[in-house]
Amino acid sequence: MRTLIVSLILLCSQSLGAQPVMVAVAANMKEAFTEIAAAYKTNNQSDFRVVYGSSGNFTAQIMNGAPFKLFISADEHFPLELYRQGKTINEGTVYAIGKLTFISKKSFNASSLKNKADLAKLIGNANKVAIAKPDLAPYGKAAIEYLKAEGLWELAKDKLIYGDNIGVATMYVVSGAADVGFTALSLASSADVAKETSYTVLDSKQYQPIAQRMVLMKRAPKEAIELYQFMQSPQAKGILQKYGYITP
C-alpha cells in the first residue's frame, strides 16, 4: 500500500512538472520572439507555451488569475500596473524600444513617403486605415499620438478600423481590408508581411517612446526566470536589433 501511495505521488509530481510555463507576449514581438525562443531552446530543455496578443488583454487576464508566469509587454504601463497590484516579483525591466511604422498595400507605396504632405495624400486616398485598439495596444496609442501631432487626426479618424492587437491591425493591410495602417517595424519588416506591403518608419519625436517592459509573476518557476534572463542576453538583443528594436 505504501509503495502504491509513493508511486501515485511521483506520478502526480511528474504530471505537474510536465505542465508548460505560460508566457504572454505582445503581438508586435511575434516574429522576434519566435526566433529568440528557438535560440533559447538550442541550449535549454524548458517547456513553455507562448500566447500572443494585446498587452491590455493580457493584463486583464493576469489580474483575473490567468496562469502566465512571464509577461513580455509592448509598453511599460501595463507591467507596472501589475506590479502596483502586487502580481509581479518586481518592476521588471525594459528589454526594447519599439518603432512605429506606416504600412500600405503595394499599390499605395508607403515606402515612397518623404513628408507630411505625402502621408496626408495616402490617408486621404485610403478607404480604411488600420490601427490597433489604443486602450489595449501601445502601438495603437502611439499611432493616434502621431496622427494628432502631425495634424492628420481629422483626416484619418473616420477611416480607422481597429484590431485587437497590432498583429491583427497589420493583417488588415496585408489582406486588403485596409489600404494603409500603422504597425510595428518588427512586423512590417518581416518576410511574410513585407512581400505583400510597403512601409516607412515614422519620426519617433511625434509619439511617446514605446519602451517595452517584461515582468515575472510572483512564484515564477525557474524556467520562466531563465527565459527572462535570456531575453537580456547579447544573443537575444542581437535578434531584437535585427527586427528593428533599440535595446538597452
Model-derived regions, located:
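Absolute protein N-terminus
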Residues: M1-T3, G17-P20
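Sec-dependent N-terminal signal peptides
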Residues: T3-Q14
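Exported/periplasmic ABC-transporter solute-binding proteins
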Residues: Q19-Q45, R49-V51, G56, A60-A66, ...
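Short, P/G- and charge-enriched loop/turn segments at secondary-structure junctions
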Residues: T88-E91
